[in-house]
């Protein structure tokens, strides 16, 4: 009898610990829907959903803007994906002598996809093209009849004909934004990748840079440095912020829904980080640097049920993955 009680107690404790662990790793919150009558044709319904994974150090902040337009035969959802993706940067061991390494954030990926039938499609997004600017600033404007316009800058050149606008504003020093090649009417994806990094006036270098003698000098301290391997790297404070700190994404996707079709659909939002491993090694003549791409990848996905009739969203599940955990 005592053994049975002990087993029951142990199982209960394990379940409680598991629930607590899940709560800590993935916290969610959805704000009440706010309603705003923009003009005699358009009504805006807005709600914000947050979904965090503390273990992966990834946070999603999603703003759902439902646009009900009397002059348009479809429902429009302007979804802004923001939040935080940590680089996962891990400092090298300063005591390493002839060889050392560290991990850094080489690329960040964000995607939004419609998991439903043809009733819901991706009809526009921002940014729309490759962008290498230090700071990406764009404005999406909507006017009655389903007209969408995307312009550079935070004002976007909006005029009185625009009934609604949403902006994106993020920094990507030494990185560039690209559009996923798999982007189509059901899915849109962006990649923000290390592109042109300067090293004490030399460069620019990228993830794939290579010299037959010195390798990839992306973060190499010095070719003939007398320092230990663990101290012969570009100082941390000189590395781009996205390589060693956090990336704060801001992307917009526009989804269109046929009004007479299904009232509910699913939308999946995925944030991902690719970590590279950078190494240096003394070959008895000079130092050689190398960069190994995508040595650790973490992915955090949230799936939402969208109620087009009531203009609400509900988180129906999260999923997290990591390749080569513990590096």
Curated annotation (Swiss-Prot):
GO biological process terms on file: cytolysis in another organism
Keywords linked to the UniProt accession: Cytolysis, Hemolysis, Secreted, Signal, Toxin, Virulence
GO cellular component: extracellular region
Extent of the signal sequence: 1-26
Cellular compartment(s): Secreted
InterPro entries to which the protein is assigned, alphabetical: Bi-component_toxin_staph, Leukocidin/Hemolysin_toxin, Leukocidin/porin_MspA_sf
GO molecular function, one term: toxin activity
Annotated SUPFAM superfamilies: Leukocidin-like (SSF56959)
Domain of life (superkingdom): Bacteria
Primary localization: secreted
Family: Belongs to the aerolysin family.
Biological role: Part of a bi-component leucotoxin that acts by forming pores in the membrane of the target cells. The activity of LukEv-LukDv to rabbit leukocytes is similar to that of the Panton-Valentine leucocidin (PVL). LukEv-LukDv is hemolytic to rabbit red blood cells although the activity is only 8% of gamma-hemolysin.
Record's subunit section: Toxicity requires sequential binding and synergistic association of a class S and a class F component which form heterooligomeric complexes. LukEv (class S) associates with LukDv (class F).
Name recorded for this polypeptide: Leucotoxin LukDv
Annotated organism of origin: Staphylococcus aureus (strain NCTC 8325 / PS 47)
Lineage: Bacteria, Bacillati, Bacillota, Bacilli, Bacillales
